[in-house]
């Protein structure tokens, strides 16, 4: 769920997104402390008349401002590298879905099934039912099993697109002639919305993404009904 006025991230529904939120808070605290220190020093310089115009050498100060930034960078880099390794490709996904971007819709192919593919178009505002979201509903949702590792293969048929679902921490470019990969695992069922995040033409704002994460049994029933 999104926060009013976009004041915060969407609620995390995957382990990766939870880690990204923790990393964001960790980095933001470091930035806040550094900014506070810099502002304090600037205000001190502007409000005091004490200066050291004759200082030519200060080994202690130079040592501190060399070592301290290095420590801060390490504190930022280590958790960042940990998340990057967590986001790396998986060797044995439970399901693989191929996503192709078009002007201006998405097509999906479940590669583990012989003939399970469909196009996904935005539902026009005039056709929305009560309670449905404007510019975010589609005629065919991507139904996926929850609590299982899923590999998304993402490419494009025409121009640059970007397949993004914020609550899952996913954003992968769809590039013509190139196959990019993303991994997702949902910890709870629900509907998760995203949009194309790369300007791709006049109808860029009208190619939403809707993932429906369901228990494995419901996914098997859905896939059987689609074949």
From Swiss-Prot:
<comment type="subunit">
    <text>Component of the cytochrome c oxidase (complex IV, CIV), a multisubunit enzyme composed of 14 subunits. The complex is composed of a catalytic core of 3 subunits MT-CO1, MT-CO2 and MT-CO3, encoded in the mitochondrial DNA, and 11 supernumerary subunits COX4I, COX5A, COX5B, COX6A, COX6B, COX6C, COX7A, COX7B, COX7C, COX8 and NDUFA4, which are encoded in the nuclear genome.</text>
</comment>
<comment type="function">
    <text>Component of the cytochrome c oxidase, the last enzyme in the mitochondrial electron transport chain which drives oxidative phosphorylation. The respiratory chain contains 3 multisubunit complexes succinate dehydrogenase (complex II, CII), ubiquinol-cytochrome c oxidoreductase (cytochrome b-c1 complex, complex III, CIII) and cytochrome c oxidase (complex IV, CIV), that cooperate to transfer electrons derived from NADH and succinate to molecular oxygen, creating an electrochemical gradient over the inner membrane that drives transmembrane transport and the ATP synthase.</text>
</comment>
<protein>
    <recommendedName>
        <fullName>Cytochrome c oxidase subunit 2</fullName>
        <ecNumber>7.1.1.9</ecNumber>
    </recommendedName>
</protein>
<keyword id="KW-1133">Transmembrane helix</keyword>
<keyword id="KW-0479">Metal-binding</keyword>
<feature type="binding site">
    <location>
        <position position="196"/>
    </location>
    <ligand>
        <name>Cu cation A2</name>
    </ligand>
</feature>
<dbReference type="InterPro" id="IPR002429">
    <property type="entry name" value="CcO_II-like_C"/>
</dbReference>
<keyword id="KW-0812">Transmembrane</keyword>
<keyword id="KW-1278">Translocase</keyword>
<feature type="transmembrane region" description="Helical; Name=I">
    <location>
        <begin position="15"/>
        <end position="45"/>
    </location>
</feature>
<comment type="similarity">
    <text>Belongs to the cytochrome c oxidase subunit 2 family.</text>
</comment>
<keyword id="KW-0460">Magnesium</keyword>
<keyword id="KW-0813">Transport</keyword>
<dbReference type="InterPro" id="IPR036257">
    <property type="entry name" value="Cyt_c_oxidase_su2_TM_sf"/>
</dbReference>
<keyword id="KW-0679">Respiratory chain</keyword>
<dbReference type="GO" id="GO:0042773">
    <property type="term" value="P:ATP synthesis coupled electron transport"/>
</dbReference>
<keyword id="KW-0249">Electron transport</keyword>
<feature type="binding site">
    <location>
        <position position="200"/>
    </location>
    <ligand>
        <name>Cu cation A2</name>
    </ligand>
</feature>
<dbReference type="InterPro" id="IPR034210">
    <property type="entry name" value="CcO_II_C"/>
</dbReference>
<feature type="binding site">
    <location>
        <position position="161"/>
    </location>
    <ligand>
        <name>Cu cation A1</name>
    </ligand>
</feature>
<feature type="topological domain" description="Mitochondrial matrix">
    <location>
        <begin position="46"/>
        <end position="59"/>
    </location>
</feature>
<dbReference type="GO" id="GO:0005743">
    <property type="term" value="C:mitochondrial inner membrane"/>
</dbReference>
<feature type="binding site">
    <location>
        <position position="198"/>
    </location>
    <ligand>
        <name>Mg(2+)</name>
    </ligand>
</feature>
<keyword id="KW-0472">Membrane</keyword>
<feature type="binding site">
    <location>
        <position position="196"/>
    </location>
    <ligand>
        <name>Cu cation A1</name>
    </ligand>
</feature>
<keyword id="KW-0999">Mitochondrion inner membrane</keyword>
<keyword id="KW-0496">Mitochondrion</keyword>
<dbReference type="InterPro" id="IPR001505">
    <property type="entry name" value="Copper_CuA"/>
</dbReference>
<feature type="transmembrane region" description="Helical; Name=II">
    <location>
        <begin position="60"/>
        <end position="87"/>
    </location>
</feature>
<feature type="topological domain" description="Mitochondrial intermembrane">
    <location>
        <begin position="88"/>
        <end position="227"/>
    </location>
</feature>
<feature type="binding site">
    <location>
        <position position="200"/>
    </location>
    <ligand>
        <name>Cu cation A1</name>
    </ligand>
</feature>
<dbReference type="Pfam" id="PF02790">
    <property type="entry name" value="COX2_TM"/>
</dbReference>
<feature type="binding site">
    <location>
        <position position="204"/>
    </location>
    <ligand>
        <name>Cu cation A2</name>
    </ligand>
</feature>
<keyword id="KW-0186">Copper</keyword>
<dbReference type="Pfam" id="PF00116">
    <property type="entry name" value="COX2"/>
</dbReference>
<dbReference type="GO" id="GO:0005507">
    <property type="term" value="F:copper ion binding"/>
</dbReference>
<feature type="binding site">
    <location>
        <position position="198"/>
    </location>
    <ligand>
        <name>Cu cation A2</name>
    </ligand>
</feature>
<dbReference type="GO" id="GO:0045277">
    <property type="term" value="C:respiratory chain complex IV"/>
</dbReference>
<dbReference type="InterPro" id="IPR011759">
    <property type="entry name" value="Cyt_c_oxidase_su2_TM_dom"/>
</dbReference>
<dbReference type="InterPro" id="IPR045187">
    <property type="entry name" value="CcO_II"/>
</dbReference>
<dbReference type="GO" id="GO:0004129">
    <property type="term" value="F:cytochrome-c oxidase activity"/>
</dbReference>
<dbReference type="InterPro" id="IPR008972">
    <property type="entry name" value="Cupredoxin"/>
</dbReference>
């Amino acid at each position: 769920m999104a926060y009013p006025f976009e004041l915060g991230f969407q609620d995390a529904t995957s382990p990766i997104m939870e880690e990204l939120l923790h990393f964001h808070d960790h980095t933001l605290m470091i930035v806040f402390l550094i900014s506070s220190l810099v502002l304090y020093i600037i205000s001190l310089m502007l409000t005091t008349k004490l200066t050291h115009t004759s200082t030519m050498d200060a080994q202690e100060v130079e040592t501190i401002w060399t070592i301290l930034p290095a420590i801060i960078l390490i504190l930022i880099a280590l958790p960042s590298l940990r998340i990057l390794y967590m986001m790396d490709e998986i060797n044995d996904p439970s399901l693989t879905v191929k996503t192709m971007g078009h002007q201006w819709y998405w097509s999906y192919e479940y590669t583990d099934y012989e003939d399970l593919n469909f196009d996904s178009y935005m539902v026009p505002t005039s056709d929305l039912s009560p309670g449905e979201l404007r510019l975010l509903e589609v005629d065919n949702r991507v139904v996926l099993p929850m609590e299982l590792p899923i590999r998304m293969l993402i490419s494009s048929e025409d121009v640059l697109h970007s397949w993004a679902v914020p609550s899952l921490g996913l954003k992968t470019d769809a590039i013509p002639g190139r196959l990019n990969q993303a991994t997702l695992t949902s910890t709870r069922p629900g509907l998760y919305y995203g949009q194309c995040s790369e300007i791709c033409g006049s109808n860029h704002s009208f190619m939403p993404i809707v993932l429906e994460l369901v228990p494995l049994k419901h996914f098997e029933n859905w896939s059987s009904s689609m074949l």
